[in-house]
Amino acid sequence: EYAGINGIRQDTHPYADFDMMSEWCKAVTDEYPDFNIVGETWLNSNVLVSFWQKDSRLAAPRNSNLRTVMDFPLMEQMNKAFDEETTDWNGGLYRLYDYLTQDLVYADPMNLLVFLDNHDTSRFYLNEEATQNIDRYKQALVFLLTTRGIPQIYYGTEILMAADKANGDGRLRCDFPGGWKYDPRNCFYEANRTPQQNEAFTYMQKLLQWRKGNEVIAKGRLKHFAPNKGIYVYARKYGN
């Protein structure tokens, strides 16, 4: 009402009392219907995550009233899928197809937060050497920004920042280079980024500009087909 924010992320949502959080979510969204609450639901299967979404059949007759939950299982599948160049039905792009065929467990798959990484997980690239495979970045980014759900992009992804959780959470949350007087390099400026970082930055920028205002991609139903010879085809349709 005063801050003008569109929503908040509720940390470790399932840790709190179910009924209290249900009442709170309902009270907030009844008063501010355009305000969204994203619940951190860090669970390892879509069945478990789906329990916490508003109107879940699995939770009935109880109702969390939490509109948006975080799709951690899809994050895991994406990080594996784009590393596996295979046509097998148990790996590669088939992981994405197989996972999305199970969306019926969710009350509203369109209100899932989808992401490649975040401040609690290893970054999409574990180290600088891995960033040399920029095709992995491009394929994953296209999927993230065209599949169902609400995409979230962790800062630094646009310049291929890399970090392994095994080296501590501090590595995952390193400052973005630049923005402060004494930073040795300012990656807010094209001239200070490497050619590869500029390639990644421009690629994301173009994708986001294309997606902005695109109701088909943002709201359309997803139709997909089983991967064939390493090719995964899907489409989005909105209205007629």
Positions of predicted regions on the chain:
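Active-site-proximal helices and loops of the catalytic beta/alpha 8
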Residues: N6-A107, L112, N133, F143, ...
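Active-site clefts of carbohydrate-active enzymes
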Residues: D108-Q132
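Short coil/turn segments at secondary-structure boundaries
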Residues: L112, Y155-T157, K219-K223
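Alpha-helix capping/termination and helix-coil
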Residues: R123, R148-P151, R211-E215
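Conserved interdomain hinge at the start of the Helicase C-terminal
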Residues: Y137-Q139
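Substrate-binding cleft of secreted/luminal carbohydrate-active enzymes
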Residues: L141-A162
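Surface beta-strand/loop "capping" patches
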Residues: I217-G239
